[in-house]
């Protein structure tokens, strides 16, 4: 399910009056996070904050929290509260891996892809971009520009979110279960 953004922000102790940009690159915290952590806070509008999820990458977490952070940045290590962070966010910068993209898609969270691994992730990029659900940029400067462009044009984010909500069902497990039960009923009689 999806928690209302204001409630998610309250639960996570994030400012209620700020839009959340979520930055994550999988459980290992890879990708251009350091460059983005330095550049993006300088460019974000005043009504936005950057939440960086480092995952299991303790070295990255320590390097990002070694010095005082700007007021518009939060750095999180490993967390079991990813669904809440996604519910609080307006945009996620993430690798186009299967789990992250599926969870974001089901939640209707627009995606900006970074640091793709050739193969499966390339297909994910093609699929989501061709369906109007995501975008991609190469390099930290281009990513920062894209984030600011999207935040300045909420209608683009809303359109991506609506497309995701229309195209992706959060109840896939229920549909599969119902199909199996129906098929079993046909083959074996009423269960």
Indicate where each model-derived feature is located.
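Donor-nucleotide binding loops and adjacent catalytic segments primarily
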Residues: 3-88
């Amino acid at each position: 399910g999806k928690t209302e953004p204001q409630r998610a922000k309250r639960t996570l102790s994030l400012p209620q009056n700020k839009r959340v940009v979520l930055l994550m690159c999988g459980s290992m915290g890879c990708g251009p996070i350091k460059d983005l952590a330095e550049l993006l806070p300088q460019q974000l509008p005043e009504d936005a904050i950057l939440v960086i999820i480092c995952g299991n990458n303790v070295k990255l977490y320590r390097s990002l929290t070694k010095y005082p952070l700007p007021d518009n940045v939060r750095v999180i290590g490993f967390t079991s509260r990813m669904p809440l962070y996604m519910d609080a966010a307006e945009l996620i910068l993430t690798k186009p891996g299967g789990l992250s993209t599926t969870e974001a898609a089901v939640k209707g969270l627009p995606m900006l892809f970074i640091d793709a691994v050739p193969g499966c992730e390339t297909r994910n990029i093609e699929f989501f971009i061709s369906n109007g659900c995501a975008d991609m940029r190469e390099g930290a400067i281009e990513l920062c520009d894209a984030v600011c462009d999207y935040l300045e044009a909420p209608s683009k984010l809303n359109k991506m979110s609506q497309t995701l909500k229309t195209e992706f069902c959060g109840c896939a497990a229920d549909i599969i279960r119902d199909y199996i039960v129906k098929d079993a009923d046909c083959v074996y009689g009423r269960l």
